[in-house]
Amino acid sequence: MTRKLVLLRHGQSQWNLDNRFTGWVDVDLTEQGRREAAAAGRLMREEGLQFDVAHTSVLKRAIHTLQGALAELEQDWLPANKSWRLNERHYGGLQGLDKAETAAKHGEEQVKVWRRSYDIPPPPMELEDPGHPIHDRRYAGLDRNALPGTESLATTLDRVLPYWHDAIAPQLKDGKTVLVTAHGNSLRALYKYLNNVSREEILELNIPTGIPLLFELNDDLTVQSFRYLGDPEAARKAAEAVANQGKAK
């Protein structure tokens, strides 16, 4: 039996539009982002997908994308499992900074390392910073030592994988069709795990906003196939635009 999993990056957020490092800052969708969420839902409907379960982060750009997509699928009733483990990678002291200005200051290669390397985190956010997650009530029930002040993709993967093993994988093994609506780097982490992508290859992977990525999996959850829904060229261009965000103007 083929298991179906869709990974969906949230639609364009205000800070995507502004080209700023977002991380765990709770920025909402733009109108374009809301249109992308609806378009993602239409693509999934045209594919004939109906979901048994949905997962998302605790950040509203992902939650609102999920809601917009489910509305197009006429599955507004589907409950969403929300977990901080699906949050975007924490960008530490870079959060809120303009990516192009940061590239002009530190060099494009350094910014590419911070954005796309596997195990090198950005400079950390200080505990005293009011933006640190230890001061956010949505994380109040968690061990403060588990809450990051910065993350690499490697530590993001370490955060995401327990949720995959405990929540998502058992549902797929039970034959459920699963939708995960999350963020560029939490989804890159899952993509790396599912496809056994090398540390070097993951550097070049960019996930576009609002385009569903369909995985077909075997019983043991090894990958049969994966593809973006809709126009492949549109997905390629959207991923290329993500790659260009870290370049100086």
Swiss-Prot record:
UniProt keyword terms in alphabetical order: Gluconeogenesis, Glycolysis, Isomerase
Residues the record marks as site: Transition state stabilizer: 183
Organism in which the protein naturally occurs: Stenotrophomonas maltophilia (strain K279a)
Catalytic class of the enzyme: isomerase
EC number: 5.4.2.11
Positions bound to substrate: 9-16, 22-23, 61, 88-91, 99, 115-116, 184-185
UniProt key word Isomerase: yes
Function, as annotated: Catalyzes the interconversion of 2-phosphoglycerate and 3-phosphoglycerate.
Organismal lineage: Bacteria, Pseudomonadati, Pseudomonadota, Gammaproteobacteria, Lysobacterales
Alphabetical GO biological process terms: gluconeogenesis; glycolytic process
GO molecular function: phosphoglycerate mutase activity
The protein's annotated pathway: Carbohydrate degradation; glycolysis; pyruvate from D-glyceraldehyde 3-phosphate: step 3/5
Catalytic machinery residues: 10, 88
Identification of the protein by name: 2,3-bisphosphoglycerate-dependent phosphoglycerate mutase
